[in-house]
């Protein structure tokens, strides 16, 4: 509860009593001044002040002045300690009022706390003479008219501010001296005023306690007057002291406030205590964790030491055994006879005499080896092992039983190793005699000045060129072939059968300026570029499970980006896992591009305008983003730091020759850095058949690519045929003349022997039935011809047997074995069944095989001819038998043709079966509007779909026919069908039925669509793709209702 407010009376100030009180206050003020002057003059006379009779307390201005002077003296001198506190005077109240305590309880508490603090400081400071503190006087109330009067407070705001300023000045210089006692303010003898003052003092006391360094309250009257000069004031009489004693009163409100502060402090202490305990617990946990970690680390260290010890011992023994076995194996290969492990060899006494003839290289090597002393493999003594184990026992980590067990295991392992070593030595001794002659012959170097290191060690890599139609593949090949042709000379570039061979000398001349900058070292003899169509040269040809091409060049038109066949080529490259680079062709088509004929691209890029360079950068970024969409990382070749993870982009122009040298150099670099071991030359034959052609003057020939090995004239070969393996002998090995004469068919160069890699035309009898895309085998003198024939047959059968034929499907014809395999994968992807497959041109018999589908499934009576020739007899047979033949040279175009073909067949079939097929539905009759001619009813579709033309019957009424639906209305609108849960009005034609509603059937039973076996078959053939799972389930249920088999 707040303090009670004093009721203000306006008539007091208008009356004459206010003037009288003002005059009396002025008189008292003058008396106070005179008295203060007299006090200052008389030092030994005590101050005696009369009690004012007026009901107003005088305003003592001298107190503030004396207070200011005393504060100034306190700054200079040590503060003197105050004496005992005088009691406060209580003013008598009216007859009906009880006496009011002048000082508030908060002021008493403050004065008591101040007195306690001052007593503590007395022990530190020297005490001075105390000065008596005057108490404030209480003005008596007016008894004349028995009314409450307003009171003028004795202390002014000016004195308080002055005292605060003096105290702040004192704090800056020295420690503040605490006053002995605080004088109480004079208050009127009114209950409301007393309560108000007490509440104010409570707020002041609470605010002062919350501060970190509480400031002491200001003094209202003269606390100290010239402490050094003025003697202490005289004590008042006993009567006055008795009168000044305050009436006892229990301060209830301050005690409640003190209890609240106490609880708040206790709560803060509890929180702080809990935080401290939590911190201590966390530190203990961290300490325990650290100790546990130290223990675990020590255990791990001991264990690692033990393991490292074991590994070191094991490695040392294995290394010793391996070194000994290797040394003995080398000696055995050199022809040294080793009797047994551990036996000493006798030193050879054979020495060359000075001046004698030198022995051959083999005998000298054998003699030098025999002079060597073969050391016996000695094992470590057991005493050393025991000593090592004893040293580990000092760690107190292993028990005696464990050490003993390890010793036994070690001894057992040594015995096993020694036994294995003896067996290996015996085996090496057996092989030594057989290998001695060959090893000795191998040590004799054979030098041939006509062969180079590159020709001897490596073959030419086979490069395939892929890309979309009209991206410049053929132009790029022509530019590569004709780059160094000057003055009508080919400069070593020869045109091979189905391939273009670029020798290393031509590549060096073409990339001369570029290769010198990077100090290129050419190790390959050249490049073999396959110029057959991409899908033939790459996807189809198989050579012992790997693709024909070592590296592919994917040509992309920089103006158009990735196109349909480009994506197909990327998929083929991924399927074969063949590395490739990208040639960004037609850079000369960029706007404002300045052509630089036969220049490396980086030099041509430097002279371009800013707009042309920016457009080139934009095009490159678009292609990189498109390749990223195909999950390929790509970058321009001079910025590519990792060729294994990023595809190199080489800008080129087949028209001006820009970037051609860059392309050749990037191919060489990629092959030499990453795939040099793949193009290493071996004597094992690897040859793939490309095409079967009839050449005038030679008959039937085959074009092959010799990947590895050597072919000789007269070799016996085996190739795969349509009717089985073909055995024949090579009559001629032909290559075309230089490039300028390549178009003359009658001129070929005949070779006795050709080494890989090369494109060759082989002339041999009986090659008419050879299968392109298969391997060519050479039969050696010690080879099993039956095994080779089985392998050739298995190569064709593996593809033909992989065809998943269900007896119903299309017929497929392809040019090569590989193209057939690729085409079958494509048809499987688009879910087209295959019934028959064949390789080679389309004949009449193939049309007859396809016509079988006319009886089984007419929509599959088609033949797909992929890149093959169609004979005239086959075309006539197809027209007569109504078999459609679809032919094309690219795979992706077949998808559009097949969609168009099956779409036309489907529309035709639907038109034929529309009047027969019946869709399943179950109806619930809600209203009958008309009984006949026609029947008009309201129905709800419970299951299926209701369509116009659907026959309706009632199965529960002996399958009574209702009629055929001729109209459906939904929300007053005509519709062609009603779906499940639709409520519609239906018009049913009953003219052709012999039943009547409510006589043969009623509306209380379910009505259904009437299905038959013919309607089910027609629905499956023409509308199977439109049937839902719910429709199929409903048809199964209705088959049981109508008992259809």
Curated annotation (Swiss-Prot):
Q: Which domain of life is it from?
A: Eukaryota
Here the segments flagged for biased composition (Basic and acidic residues) are 8-27, 264-325, 368-384
Q: Compositional bias (Acidic residues) at which positions?
A: 62-73, 105-120, 155-169, 199-212
Q: Where is the composition biased (Low complexity)?
A: 81-92, 216-241, 351-361
Start and end residues of each tr-type G domain: 458-675
Give any single GO term for biological process. Answer: regulation of translational initiation
Family designation:
Belongs to the TRAFAC class translation factor GTPase superfamily. Classic translation factor GTPase family. IF-2 subfamily.
What name does UniProt use for this protein?
A: Eukaryotic translation initiation factor 5B
